[in-house]
Amino acid sequence: MNTVRVTFLLVFVLAVSLGQADKDENRMEMQEKTEQGKSYLDFAENLLLQKLEELEAKLLEEDSEESRNSRQKRCIGEGVPCDENVPRCCSGLVCLKPTLHGIWYKSYYCYKK
């Protein structure tokens, strides 16, 4: 039983003394690993940032095409009176003087082109 304890103690002492690394070596190794990790993280961050900027540019481009200012404002439908000088007929319609059945009305109406 004593030989087992002595053997175990001897192996333990050898493992501790031979396996113990220098603290400075450990620190240097950890610093190198963290620097490599930081450079990888910086690269990944820059790549992600570029992709996000591309997506944002596409979204802003689509928004500018479909913004409220570029939409057609309220318009007058077919068969509705309109102003001859400032026609607000919807697209595909023209402000014209009525023919035949609408002659007695003295205003213009929106008709299909």
UniProtKB/Swiss-Prot annotation:
Question: What does UniProt give as the signal peptide span?
Answer: 1-21
Proregion positions: 22-74
Which InterPro entries is this protein grouped with?
Toxin_22
Primary localization: secreted
Q: List the disulfide bonds.
A: 75-90, 82-95, 89-110
Q: Which UniProt keywords apply?
A: Disulfide bond, Ion channel impairing toxin, Knottin, Secreted, Signal, Toxin
UniProt key word Signal: yes
Question: What is the tissue localization of expression for this protein?
Answer: Expressed by the venom gland.
The places in or outside the cell where this protein is found are: Secreted
Domain of life, per UniProt, equals Eukaryota
Q: Name one GO molecular function term.
A: toxin activity
- Which Gene Ontology CC terms are recorded? extracellular region
- What does the UniProt entry state concerning the protein's domains? The presence of a 'disulfide through disulfide knot' structurally defines this protein as a knottin.
Say what the protein does: Probable ion channel inhibitor.
Q: What's this protein's family per the entry?
A: Belongs to the neurotoxin 14 (magi-1) family. 01 (HNTX-16) subfamily.
Protein name, entry field: U11-theraphotoxin-Hhn1u
